[in-house]
């Protein structure tokens, strides 16, 4: 459905309702991709990989390699205690000349974890990750970890929504769009 509003905004809504088209002051069309963390988790899954603070960094790096992820949550007594990433390993172990086999996760993990709820928008998450220079966001509701999203997950989401929007626009223009 194509509608207009006072700000010369046109919204093209289709089953996923993941895009809005805006016309700027010069009449140039701009596509805004929308969506929530919940949408990403439904698509990617909510499997969470973690380590305990008392495991060695070597064990954490092995697990990251085994699961093909760049970060692991650190769980202690069933609660989120921190996050450890490849970046933590590089900066706090390799560059300091430490051994990953004798250094514990609790010594290098990031304890102050930035997290979001599943209702946060993709845009809000991208902004939060960019401002804080982080690559992974735990998704938490009522102190329960629901999943983790990476900047790569957000980029994949945006690209897929752009492709879907282009397809719908092409169908709309060619009159093949359902009314």
Q: Where are these predicted regions, by residue range?
A:
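Tandem CBS (Cystathionine beta-synthase) repeat/Bateman regulatory domains
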Residues: 2-179
